[in-house]
Amino acid sequence: MSLADSVLAVNNDLPIRTDKPVHSGKVRSVYWLTESDSRRLINDKGYKVPLDTPLAIMVISDRISAFDCIFHGEGGLQGIPGKGAALNAISNHWFKLFAEQGLADSHILDIPHPFVWIVQKARPIKVEAICRQYITGSMWRAYAKGEREFCGIRLPEGLKKDQKLPELIITPSTKGILTGIPGVPAQDDVNISRQDIEANYQAFGFESLSDIDLYETLLKDGFKVISDALAQLDQVFVDTKFEFGYVTDKNGQSKLIYMDEVGTPDSSRIWDGAAYRDSKIVENSKEGFRQFLLNHVADADVLLNKDRMPEREALARDNALPLDAMMNVSRTYTGVAEKVTGKTITLAANPKADIIAILKKNYGLID
């Protein structure tokens, strides 16, 4: 088995039966099933959703993105070995814990393969729900320049870089480009306040004002569940991004659920606890890869300056990263997954062939 063959880099070309275009994101691809296949699976598999619920196959890849670009490595390595399986395993673990502790359900109905989720269609909240327990990254850079108000929250004077904040804070941003909302620029990833959300809750996808309280509760409770569990592993849960949406349950009632992924090295910052106590930062998340890139390229401004996006895209496209750097990232992701779940992440010789075989034999989704 070659290392390159074990990586699933292209995940939008599987022969899954669908009558809609495949939606491809930076890491995942979504195949919406036909109405008849959705109904058949709901019946055959006993999924606890209404019969008319649209279902999708969500396939994760091993691609790695940073600074809005996809990077690759030497030797034809088009992604990070084990990354996709690690991300799914971590999310599966936290989603299960959330449900067991009575927080809320997720969009996942079934897990046919380490790279694959069967999900129900949700009506997404158009908010990136970001929770911070420490001041670092972009927040610290802004604070160091004199900013004190973040998303309507005022921080005290005298905070130090990487310090624990007095309390957990929520700093939401827009998900996608939203138009026609007073005071909110029509740009992706714009910081917003709770007041912005309350004044325009329907435009952000909330069905009621009270659901804003519920979303904040689920965000804080979910953060605490993950933070407490990671602390047992001597890991520090620094900050994270959650996503939420609505689904209709079997009784026809709308309910708020967790979506996308949670508590992963892609969506969170995680620090090594022993190193932090020694006043050092050891990143166990994608932040380590970002820092590597900033030190690796000749001109870091290319990665940071949005006005230089064409140069950045060319840099990512034309430069293969060292194999040892890619494998360091692999060890970070699989290491976190194995700590969190207690299970080994195994590389498959040909993950795409495995996925096709399972979806054909066990789910009848491939002709």
Curated annotation (Swiss-Prot):
Disulfide bond annotation, renumbered to this chain: none
Catalytic activity: 5-amino-1-(5-phospho-D-ribosyl)imidazole-4-carboxylate + L-aspartate + ATP = (2S)-2-[5-amino-1-(5-phospho-beta-D-ribosyl)imidazole-4-carboxamido]succinate + ADP + phosphate + 2 H(+)
Pathway: Purine metabolism; IMP biosynthesis via de novo pathway; 5-amino-1-(5-phospho-D-ribosyl)imidazole-4-carboxamide from 5-amino-1-(5-phospho-D-ribosyl)imidazole-4-carboxylate: step 1/2
Domain of life of the organism encoding this protein: Bacteria
Its EC number(s): 6.3.2.6
Keyword DNA repair attached: no
A GO CC term attached to the entry: cytoplasm
Keywords: ATP-binding, Ligase, Nucleotide-binding, Purine biosynthesis
GO molecular function: ATP binding; phosphoribosylaminoimidazolesuccinocarboxamide synthase activity
InterPro entries attached to this UniProt entry: SAICAR_synt/ADE2_N (IPR028923), SAICAR_synthase_Vibrio-typ (IPR014106), SAICAR_synthetase_CS (IPR018236)
Family, similarity comment: Belongs to the SAICAR synthetase family.
Protein name in the entry: Phosphoribosylaminoimidazole-succinocarboxamide synthase
Lineage: Bacteria, Pseudomonadati, Pseudomonadota, Gammaproteobacteria, Alteromonadales
